[in-house]
Amino acid sequence: MIELSNITKVFQQNGRSITALADVSLHVPTGQIYGVIGASGAGKSTLIRCVNLLERPTEGKVLVDGQELTQLSDSQLTRARRQIGMIFQHFNLLSSRTVFGNISLPLELDNTPKADITKRVNELLELVGLADKHDVYPANLSGGQKQRVAIARALASNPKVLLCDEATSALDPATTRSILELLKDINRRLGLTILLITHEMDVVKRICDQVAVISDGRLIEKDTVSEVFSHPKTPLAQKFIQSTLHLDIPDDYLTRLSPDYHPDTTPLLRMEFTGKSVDAPLLSEVARRFNVNNNIISAQMDYAGGVKFGIMLAEMHGNNADIKDAIQFLQESHVTIEVLGYV
């Protein structure tokens, strides 16, 4: 549905050339939710704005539903953009128009008959859960309700693609979850292809099928969400994943934690389990095999892309040689282990 081929975008600023995107290629299959994650300034917004040519690439091709957008005339591009809806971090609603009036605006600009406008807007209000807000003005809506109006407006022309530019970053966590569930529901009901950008791995984890990691204008990793969570290939992907499952070291352990091993201390381990290692009774196995005892301090488990993954803080008691053998066995069983120190 979306094919970006060798996209480069260079901005001119104060006589200097600034490369925002460098040779980026990306394929978003029809009907999928695809996430692009990166830190501020990584090039995310520039990338998504190249899809509908709000930013025209310096080099490369942009294909949406088989059309090469960079080769279209202005009138052809206008028609093609009707198949590409877009929502933003800020809702950009017209304060002088009601909810109905905001959603109907693109249809009015397209000279759609009034009866068809009314029918379509009512369908969309039902879809986004705002059937009772028909005549309400934006000033009387919550942030989540405003974003629902923006989503309905973006869907007014029956687009095949929806672009989401940090669409939940201005919302509180509970509202973010409800908007993500709405996007997932719309994707499922309408078969809509969704490309979203975010700086939060929680967003990717909740609704995306595939994810790409962008850094300094380059895509450094891309795969299914389950594969990236199970086997991250870059330190940045690993960092984003760790941000979704974070366990704090208890204060009483922090006060005793030392970076150096002593014979009377025991290692404090941070263990990450993905794929098959989540369900395997590995800690019981190392206890039997290597004569070590594990004291689990805290643990957490979650799902991403249909795959379970988890994190654990634990002490491992035993003699030093047995502990080293146990850690090596766990690592060979696809458990990622970090020795945080000794207590």
Curated annotation (Swiss-Prot):
Domain of life, source organism: Bacteria
CDD domains documented for this protein: ABC_MetN_methionine_transporter (cd03258)
Residue intervals of the ABC transporter domain: 2-241
Keywords, ordered alphabetically: Amino-acid transport, ATP-binding, Cell inner membrane, Cell membrane, Membrane, Nucleotide-binding, Translocase, Transport
UniProt keyword Cell membrane present: yes
GO cellular component terms, A-Z: Gram-negative-bacterium-type cell wall; plasma membrane
Subcellular location: Cell inner membrane
A Pfam family that the UniProt record links to this protein: ABC_tran
Gene3D superfamilies in alphabetical order: 3.30.70.260, P-loop containing nucleotide triphosphate hydrolases
Reactions that this protein is recorded to catalyse: L-methionine(out) + ATP + H2O = L-methionine(in) + ADP + phosphate + H(+); D-methionine(out) + ATP + H2O = D-methionine(in) + ADP + phosphate + H(+)
Keyword Mitochondrion: no
Protein EC: 7.4.2.11
Binding-site residues, ATP: G38, A39, S40, G41, A42, G43, K44, S45
GO function terms (MF aspect): ABC-type D-methionine transporter activity; ATP binding; ATP hydrolysis activity
Membrane disposition: Peripheral membrane protein
UniProt function note: Part of the ABC transporter complex MetNIQ involved in methionine import. Responsible for energy coupling to the transport system.
Assigned protein family: Belongs to the ABC transporter superfamily. Methionine importer (TC 3.A.1.24) family.
Subunit structure as annotated in this protein's UniProt entry: The complex is composed of two ATP-binding proteins (MetN), two transmembrane proteins (MetI) and a solute-binding protein (MetQ).
Protein name as catalogued: Methionine import ATP-binding protein MetN 3
Organism of origin: Pectobacterium atrosepticum (strain SCRI 1043 / ATCC BAA-672)
